[in-house]
């Protein structure tokens, strides 16, 4: 396990040495990984750092407003509305790897635009060890590892937490006195809801996934899962009132894990599962059914794509 104080001192010195007198931008998502990386980088280089939050249109319900409120103390924070550009980049793409690469490409282009504006030579990222293992082992690319384009307009990419597991990141976050809403936050994938809708990403699928994920996180908070999510799988026949409908199938997944490398599906009580399905089908008229995923990792991954 990492010793937080020693790690923080080491990484602050390392970031300062890597960046020198140059400027840097950091990809800020509001999750514990990027927030911890931002705190480390800010301690190291101060106003040379510009945090950038990109509203991709693929985020959780209320995410952008929460980012604005949580990080309003950072005067240099940039919030970029790139929703249309990301949907355009994903148009017609159904393959999971291609989706991740398209998202990685667009992320980098957004950061390059800001970097040119603030004359930044470095990109700081919150990449952690499981991201690298899955990308290097070709299990699946992460938008900030294997999903990066081959040509990147930065002098260097700085990844201070590339050797940490998620639980170690949380220890460092606590040592840095990050708010509990950040330090203890449930993992959310970099590509966002794009990998929680199977097949092509559309506004309709994203709307269903966003509302369903909100329900799942609310209802399962007391169970303290390592990660809980809802994914839009496809369509199936259902009945609403007296009418036959062809609506979306939503899969609910909740797992326990230490580091994300392996995970066990949580055993949830029937009443909770019924409450979740009732809310999802009741609040989304185009959802026909809800299922619960009982598969561990392995053989499954935690996310669907």
Curated annotation (Swiss-Prot):
Source species, domain of life: Archaea
Pfam families referenced in this protein's UniProt entry, alphabetically: GMP_synt_C, NAD_synthase
GMPS ATP-PPase domain ranges (all copies): 2-185
SUPFAM superfamilies: Adenine nucleotide alpha hydrolases-like, GMP synthetase C-terminal dimerisation domain
Keywords: ATP-binding, GMP biosynthesis, Ligase, Nucleotide-binding, Purine biosynthesis
Record-listed ATP binding positions: 29-35
Catalytic activity annotation: XMP + L-glutamine + ATP + H2O = GMP + L-glutamate + AMP + diphosphate + 2 H(+)
Cellular component per GO, a single term: cytosol
GO molecular function (one): ATP binding
The EC number(s) this enzyme carries: 6.3.5.2
PANTHER family: GMP SYNTHASE [GLUTAMINE-HYDROLYZING], GMP SYNTHASE-RELATED
Record function comment: Catalyzes the synthesis of GMP from XMP.
Quaternary data: Heterodimer composed of a glutamine amidotransferase subunit (A) and a GMP-binding subunit (B).
Protein name as catalogued: GMP synthase [glutamine-hydrolyzing] subunit B
Native source species: Natronomonas pharaonis (strain ATCC 35678 / DSM 2160 / CIP 103997 / JCM 8858 / NBRC 14720 / NCIMB 2260 / Gabara) (Halobacterium pharaonis)
Organism taxonomic ancestry: Archaea, Methanobacteriati, Methanobacteriota, Stenosarchaea group, Halobacteria
């Amino acid at each position: 396990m990492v010793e937080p104080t020693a790690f923080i001192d080491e990484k602050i010195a390392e970031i300062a040495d890597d960046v020198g007198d140059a400027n840097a931008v950091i990809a800020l998502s509001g999750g514990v990984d990027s927030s911890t990386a931002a705190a480390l980088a800010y301690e190291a280089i101060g106003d040379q750092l510009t945090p950038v939050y990109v509203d991709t249109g693929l985020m959780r319900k209320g995410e952008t407003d929460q980012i604005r409120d949580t990080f309003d103390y950072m005067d240099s924070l940039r919030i970029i509305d790139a929703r249309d550009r990301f949907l355009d980049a994903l148009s017609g793409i159904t393959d999971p790897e291609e989706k991740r690469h398209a998202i990685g490409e667009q992320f980098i282009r957004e950061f390059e635009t800001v970097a040119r504006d603030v004359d930044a030579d470095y990109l700081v990222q919150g990449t952690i060890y499981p991201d690298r293992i899955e990308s290097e082992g070709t299990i699946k690319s992460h938008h900030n590892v294997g999903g990066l384009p081959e040509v990147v307009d930065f002098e260097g990419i700085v990844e201070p937490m590339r050797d940490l597991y998620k639980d170690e990141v949380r220890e460092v976050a606590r040592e840095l006195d990050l708010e509990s809403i950040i330090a203890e936050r449930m993992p959310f994938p970099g590509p966002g809801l794009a990998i929680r809708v199977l097949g092509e990403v559309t506004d309709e699928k994203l709307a269903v996934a966003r509302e369903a994920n909100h329900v799942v996180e609310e209802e399962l908070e007391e169970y303290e899962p390592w990660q809980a999510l809802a994914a839009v799988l496809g369509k199936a026949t259902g009945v609403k009132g007296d009418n036959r409908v062809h609506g979306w199938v939503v899969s609910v997944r909740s797992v326990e894990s230490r580091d994300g490398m392996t995970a066990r599906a949580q055993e949830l009580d029937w009443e909770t599962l019924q409450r979740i399905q009732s809310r999802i089908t009741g609040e989304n008229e185009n959802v026909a059914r809800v299922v619960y995923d009982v598969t561990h990792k392995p053989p499954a991954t935690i996310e669907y794509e």
